[in-house]
Swiss-Prot record:
The chain crosses the membrane at residues 13-33, 43-63, 66-86, 102-122. Gene3D superfamilies: SH3 Domains. It is found in: Cell membrane. It comes from the Eukaryota. Belongs to the SHO1 family. This is High osmolarity signaling protein SHO1. Forms homooligomers. Residues 270-280, 289-298 have a biased composition (Gly residues). GO terms for cellular component: plasma membrane. Residues 1-12, 64-65, 123-385 are cytoplasmic. It is a multi-pass membrane protein. Residues 34-42, 87-101 are extracellular.
Length: 385
């Protein structure tokens, strides 16, 4: 999680209540310091000291983004502070006419009001009307630095350093990212060309007749020459001439997620499509061990090896992005994604989402239609599974 002032400043309720509490406490401590000590209730000093400790604790919890984990503890602590401030107010008003005592009493009255608000909010259920009204003022357009201790911004700033192809993002120029679902990566529609793909430096192709871990993006052909196409991952020739070594990028086998179904006329056993398209008549839902689709190897391969076919439609535990969604959450409110942030997803109230990476104020989420993105954690509630 980590300490970050942005976690505190992004919550209007936290800013307003903590700021109000500090001002009220300054009024109370100023009145206590200016009053005659023989007429001042000595126990009120402890109540004033206890109150500033509670204010600092709440500030630290908001800054560390774990206020939700200590709400019930805070209810008990703030309730004690409420008793102290109300008792001090009674003693200061009715037992002395000192100006300092009355000033301290005014500060204690303000602190009592603040403590009552905190008790109602921290002790209330997230779906209660009061909590829903307060949470409705939360900022939507913040920079999402809270996700995984700022990993959202860190990954966006370093997008050009190491982005695996088919992992849900492609680089369109410098720093711009365009999401697309890996399940449609083989369609050849709206796919970046090889000129626009910038890959991190990977292992070079071997010198032997075959390779098992490489794939070449040939800028002249504008299509991948993959080592895992059509089930023939171990039979990609390496003696293919490349006329432009400067524009050639290399991918390891871990980068091939989502490119398995790409076809190329230069690779044995693949379809006959060009560019990033699909081979003619290629069956995208099943692959056989024989290395041929209906666009490559013999047609009998798909008929005789039905038991060896693999369904390439992703299951609940295989999303194409390498994320396993371990939790389910219910949307407490409807949310419209920020059009300027391609990573956000929209959802409606009471919709059931699959979530993961639940640290921070922004969680990884997947809708029922398969859309993957991030959602604000204060708009959803984890369900018991």
């Amino acid at each position: 999680m980590g300490f970050s002032l942005s976690n505190f400043t992004s919550d209007p309720f936290a800013i307003s209540t903590v700021s109000f509490g500090i001002m009220a406490w300054v009024v109370a401590i100023a009145g206590a310091a200016s009053s005659k000590q023989e007429n001042f209730p000595h126990f009120s000093w402890w109540g004033i000291s206890y109150q500033i400790v509670i204010i600092l604790i709440i500030f630290v919890l908001y800054a560390n983004n774990n206020i939700e984990l200590y709400k019930f503890t805070l209810v008990g602590l703030v309730s004690i502070a409420f008793i102290y401030t109300t008792n001090s107010t009674n003693n200061l008003i009715y037992n002395s006419n000192s100006a300092g005592n009355l000033c301290c009493a005014a500060g204690c009255i303000l602190l009592s009001i603040l403590n009552l608000i905190w008790i109602l909010y921290f002790g209330g259920h997230p779906e209660s009307p009061t909590n829903q009204f307060i949470d409705s003022f939360s900022l939507r357009g913040q920079g999402h630095e809270q996700l995984g201790s700022g990993s959202h911004n860190h990954n966006a700033n370093n997008a050009n350093n190491n982005i695996p192809i088919g992992a849900g993002n492609a680089i369109i120029g410098k720093g711009e990212m365009s999401p697309y679902d890996d399940r449609f990566a083989a369609s050849g529609v709206n796919q970046p060309t090889s000129e626009s793909l910038r890959l991190a430096s990977g292992p070079q192709m071997g010198n032997g007749p075959f390779t098992t871990t490489g794939a070449i993006i040939n800028p002249n052909l504008q299509q991948p020459l993959s080592g895992s196409i059509g089930g023939s991952a171990h039979h990609t020739p390496t003696n293919i001439n490349n006329n432009n070594n400067n524009n050639t990028g290399y991918m390891t086998s871990s980068h091939l997620t989502g490119l398995e179904n790409f076809s190329s006329p230069h690779v044995p056993g693949s379809g006959t499509g060009a560019g990033l398209g699909v081979g003619a008549g290629r069956d995208l839902t099943h692959n056989s061990n024989g290395g041929g689709g209906s666009g490559g190897g013999p047609a009998s391969a798909n008929n005789s090896n039905n038991t060896n076919k693999r369904n390439t439609i992703y299951t609940d535990s295989e999303t194409g992005t390498g994320i396993t969604f371990r939790y389910k959450a219910k949307a407490l409110y409807s949310y419209d994604a920020n059009p300027d942030d391609i990573n956000e997803i929209s959802f409606v109230k009471d919709e059931i989402l699959e979530v993961d990476d639940i640290d921070g104020k922004w969680w990884q989420a997947r809708r029922a239609n398969g859309q993957v993105g991030i959602c604000p954690s204060n708009y959803v509630k984890l369900l018991d599974t």
